C-alpha cells in the first residue's frame, strides 16, 4: 500500500505562510524555509514589542508631564506626590493628554495641588 501523504493540507499550510510574508525583501517572501523562519521571528518581535509598548508609552507620558510641570515651577515627582497627597486620582495618560492638548486644565490641576 502506498504511503499516504496529505499534499492538499501541506500545500495549503505553505501557501498560508507565504501569503503572510508577502512584501518581505528577497528570499524572505518566496522561499519556504526562509519565509517560515522570518514569519516566526516576526511573531516573537510582535510579542516582545507588545510588552515594551506599555513601557515606552509610560515613559513618554512621564516626560510630557515633567516638561509641563516644570513650566509651572514644579518637578514631576513633586507633582505626583502632591496629587496623591490631595487624593486626586488621575492617571499619567490623562495627565499627559491634558498637558499637551489642554494646558489651561493642566495649569488648574497644578494650581490646586500647589496650595
Swiss-Prot record:
InterPro entries: Ribosomal_bL20, RIBOSOMAL_L20_CS, Ribosomal_protein_bL20_C
Example GO BP: translation
Keywords, ordered alphabetically: Ribonucleoprotein, Ribosomal protein, RNA-binding, rRNA-binding
GO cellular component, one term: ribonucleoprotein complex
GO molecular function, one term: structural constituent of ribosome
Coiled coil: none
Function: Binds directly to 23S ribosomal RNA and is necessary for the in vitro assembly process of the 50S ribosomal subunit. It is not involved in the protein synthesizing functions of that subunit.
The family this protein is said to belong to: Belongs to the bacterial ribosomal protein bL20 family.
Protein name, UniProt field: Large ribosomal subunit protein bL20
The organism of origin for this protein: Porphyromonas gingivalis (strain ATCC BAA-308 / W83)
Lineage: Bacteria, Pseudomonadati, Bacteroidota, Bacteroidia, Bacteroidales
Amino acid at each position: 500500500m502506498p504511503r499516504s501523504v496529505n499534499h492538499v493540507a501541506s500545500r495549503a499550510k505553505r501557501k498560508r505562510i507565504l501569503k503572510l510574508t508577502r512584501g518581505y525583501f528577497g528570499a524572505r517572501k518566496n522561499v519556504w524555509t526562509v519565509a517560515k523562519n522570518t514569519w516566526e521571528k516576526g511573531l516573537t518581535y510582535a510579542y516582545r514589542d507588545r510588552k515594551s509598548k506599555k513601557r515606552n508609552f509610560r515613559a513618554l507620558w512621564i516626560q510630557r508631564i515633567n516638561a509641563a510641570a516644570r513650566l509651572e515651577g514644579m518637578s514631576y515627582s513633586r507633582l505626583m506626590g502632591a496629587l496623591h497627597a490631595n487624593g486626586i486620582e488621575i492617571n499619567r495618560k490623562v495627565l499627559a493628554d491634558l498637558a499637551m492638548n489642554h494646558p489651561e486644565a493642566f495649569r488648574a490641576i497644578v494650581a490646586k495641588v500647589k496650595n
